[in-house]
């Protein structure tokens, strides 16, 4: 195999494809590599860790077709180190590949590409729809941080993608907080739902372009494809909890305040939070203010008071300050609404005038 590819294009492609190679030690060495295929369909880069996989096309000149597998990390380091514009040539001979440009050359040992598994492309038996890549990225990125990092309950370490009635939504929760993001997708008329491991979902949205993406899934796999690439991920087959049961239908207290004021007050209060990251959130009906108090015996204490439009009962709840801050960067509205349900019950945060995003957080023990 002999191929020539633009330096910048190859470096970018290798960087994105290497994300899907196996990072841990494995009995199948080729899983830690990138397979380069040069043939009638052009040049393709492939990688899989058996959880996720990618098949990406790249522009270049094929002087001699062939297939080769190279260590992903080493190839990424080499291709990212070439400066300037111009072409990189890869020439395969025996068990090595010579990578050369106008300024230097490297000889890299190959991996046994014959062991590379087939990347599955699911039949569209469960879901089949098209969506803008930029919309899909925003949908998943908005909720994925709320997924649990633990592997004890795989469903809580996942992002739920579901559709019904022309609306598609993404949901994630770690049982302490929950985020739901909805967008209108009129072309979707058949209900569906599937669970993607949150880590896989984040790798996918860091890779797909902003153009139209076709999404299709069966019971075990989901694929995201466009003319330049195809990505797959295994699905979590455990049922997702019925989170709608915990979303409050009514509230005892509601306050509307400026998002930036709330964020700044939380940032200052965090300095004085205790080892549990706790701050106390108070709603004063008489003073029309939301208060944030924090105390740390080693540092000191703080008291913040934010003017608010407020109604309902006076109430005080304790929260992990990081969980209160997390949704604020995801809300574009200037003002937010804090809706409390009572002692020991969840707080709902929304942007004013934005029904597409909901964030729910459970209070800490008083």
Language-model region placement:
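Structural preference for solvent-exposed beta-strand-turn elements
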Residues: 1-366
């Amino acid at each position: 195999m002999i191929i020539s590819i633009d330096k910048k294009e190859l470096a970018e492609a290798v960087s994105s494809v290497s994300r899907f190679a196996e990072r841990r030690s494995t009995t199948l060495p080729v899983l830690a590599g990138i397979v380069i295929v040069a043939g009638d369909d052009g040049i393709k880069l492939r990688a899989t860790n058996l959880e996720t996989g990618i098949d990406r096309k790249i522009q270049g000149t094929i002087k001699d077709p062939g297939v080769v597998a190279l260590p992903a990390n080493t190839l990424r380091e080499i291709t990212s180190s070439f400066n300037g514009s111009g072409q990189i040539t890869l020439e395969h001979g025996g068990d090595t590949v010579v990578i050369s440009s106008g300024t230097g050359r490297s000889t890299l040992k190959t991996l046994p590409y014959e062991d590379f598994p087939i990347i599955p492309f699911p039949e569209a038996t469960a879901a089949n729809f098209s969506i803008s890549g930029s919309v899909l990225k925003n949908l998943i990125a908005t909720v994925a941080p709320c997924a649990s990092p633990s592997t004890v309950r795989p469903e809580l370490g996942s992002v739920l993608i579901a559709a019904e009635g022309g609306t598609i939504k993404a949901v994630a929760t770690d049982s302490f907080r929950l985020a739901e993001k909805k967008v209108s997708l009129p072309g979707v008329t058949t209900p569906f739902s599937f669970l993607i491991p949150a880590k896989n979902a984040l790798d996918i949205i860091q890779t797909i372009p902003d153009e139209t993406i076709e999404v299709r899934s069966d019971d075990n796999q989901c694929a995201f494809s466009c003319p330049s690439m195809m990505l797959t991920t295994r699905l979590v087959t455990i049922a997702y909890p019925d989170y709608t049961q915990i979303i409050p239908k009514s509230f005892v207290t509601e306050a509307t305040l400026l998002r930036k004021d709330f964020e700044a007050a939380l940032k200052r209060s965090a300095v004085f939070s205790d080892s549990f990251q706790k701050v106390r959130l108070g709603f004063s009906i008489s003073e029309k203010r939301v208060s944030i108090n924090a105390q740390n015996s080693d540092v000191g204490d703080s008291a913040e008071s934010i003017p608010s439009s407020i109604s309902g009962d006076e109430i005080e709840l304790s929260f992990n300050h990081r969980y209160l801050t997390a949704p604020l960067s995801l809300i574009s509205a200037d003002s937010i609404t804090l809706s409390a349900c009572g002692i020991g019950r969840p707080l709902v945060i929304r942007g004013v005038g934005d029904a597409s995003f909901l964030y729910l957080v459970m209070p800490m023990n008083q």
